[in-house]
Amino acid sequence: MLSTMSNLPIVAGISTTATTGTTSTATASTSTSGSVNTTATNNNNNTSASNSTSASSATANGGIGTNSGNSLQYYYTGNNTSNSVDGNKYSLPSIYFTPQDSINNTSHTYNPYTTVSGAVTPQNYQLDYSQSSTVNNNYQFTLPNQQLSSPQQQQYNRSYSNSLMPNYHYNNTTTNINTNVGSNTSPQLSNSNTPNPISPVLIPDKDNTYNNTNNVLVSSYPSMTMNQIQQQQQQYLQPSQQYQYSYNQYYMQPYYHNPQQSAPQQVQKPAQTEKLPHLSVTNIDYSSLVSYTVSPSLKRKRRTAKKSLSPSSTSSLSMMINHDSTNNGTTSTATTTRSSSTSSATSSSIGVAAADSFPCPQCNKVFQKPYNLKSHMKTHSNEKPYHCNICFKRFARSHDKKRHELLHQGVKNFKCQGYLNDGVTSWGCGKTFARSDALSRHFRTETGWLCIRPLMEEAKRLEEEEQQRQQQAQQQQQVPQQSQVSEQIGVNVGEIKFNDEYYDNSNFIKKLLQSNK
């Protein structure tokens, strides 16, 4: 028999079946006593015969049962032993043989070359990879009788299922394999303790002495040569190397950014320093700026505060002023004028507030005209017939809808910028706003106050010049009353209160500037 069969262990209790025909299957097993039970079944006559043979063939040939004229089919798992015949080494993969014998402690390695161990030459080694549903996808190869080293000249077929091919997947579990040949008492080979290789690098090489004992791998891939395994390793390694290179190239390399330094843009000023024709030296209309600076809400708050002043408090204030002047022993025109102006301003403001105020019954807003109150009341109703043509918003008033649509168009007609009387000096930050109330809120902020500060300083200077001009005119007309006129002017300039008539005057800007000093 083959020298490779010398390491097979002797297992008791396994029946042997031989089937005559084109493809016959037999399982040989020996008992410890040395007797071999062989059962042959003929496919044509459906007869069975039981023979009892001596232990000569079992002991001499490594426990292999024989049946003359019939070919035997074996299933092997485990390690492999290799022999040299004529200087050539032929061996089957280690996964097709049973574990090595305890007597033979030689370590075996995985041989990628699919060859047959024994006195078989490569020319006579024939593989049949035919697959069909009838043979259950089994691979078979035939060993002729002339190539057997045993005196028992017989031909047997060695077949293995498609599921016994080497596993090149990288799962960490092994699959149980049934080695049933025709008997229910056939053992099941399984091993889940030995880990499978988890990466292509761990696939054993030809000269590696790693012991693959009792490791049964299942796969549908055919056996591979060493060159194919190396190519597969390179295919697995190349993507990881490329990924690592791209990763290092993207994350590890420094990033150099050299932005082109552009020269700062210089604000182009008007080349002509001549005064603009539409601007006047003496008369400057600041009504638009004042209307932006002081919103109607501030007016309403001040008007509400003045309502709290009662006539008794006003009279007491005037009495206090007169009492102070009497105790000092001097009665001046300025003090009398101051008290009278205060009382008149207070009474006029109270009367105007009582007559021209139209408060909203649902909120704290107060309006000067009934039409404004009527328009405002629409905002408290649930009716919103005007809807935006661009978005889903709806409005109660048409002008609110038009003002909203300007936001979609990007129209910003209100700008914080202007020129002083000389036509060269500019004021403002240049920001644009879509609504006038947004610009007025900007003026009330600290930044907006700095924007209009040059304009206020110019207004203060022009008012002082106007006051000096008036004083000179009065001095020319009435020289004896010069002091009285100057005091009267001082009272009119410095003691004017914040009432409704004062909002449309440019003196308001001057008053705000003096209050911040």
UniProtKB/Swiss-Prot annotation:
SUPFAM superfamilies for the chain: beta-beta-alpha zinc fingers (SSF57667)
GO molecular function: zinc ion binding
Tagged with keyword NAD: no
GO terms for cellular component: nucleus
Zn finger (C2H2-type) start-end: 358-380, 386-408, 414-446
SMART domains: ZnF_C2H2 (SM00355)
Keywords annotated in UniProt: Cell adhesion, Metal-binding, Nucleus, Repeat, Transcription, Transcription regulation, Zinc, Zinc-finger
Localization terms from the record: Nucleus
InterPro entries named among the record's database cross-references: Krueppel_C2H2_ZnFinger, Znf_C2H2_sf, Znf_C2H2_type
Compositionally biased intervals (Polar residues): 186-196
Disruption phenotype: Decreases cell adherence to silicone substrate. Blocks biofilm formation.
Biased composition (Low complexity): 19-61, 174-185, 308-318, 325-346, 469-485
PROSITE patterns documented for this protein: ZINC_FINGER_C2H2_1, ZINC_FINGER_C2H2_2
Region (Disordered): 19-64, 174-209, 296-346, 462-485
Role played: Transcription factor that regulates pH-induced filamentation with RIM101. Required for yeast cell adherence to silicone substrate and biofilm formation.
PANTHER family listed in its UniProt record: IP01015P-RELATED (PTHR24377)
Protein name as it appears in the record: Transcriptional regulator CRZ2
Organism: Candida albicans (strain SC5314 / ATCC MYA-2876) (Yeast)
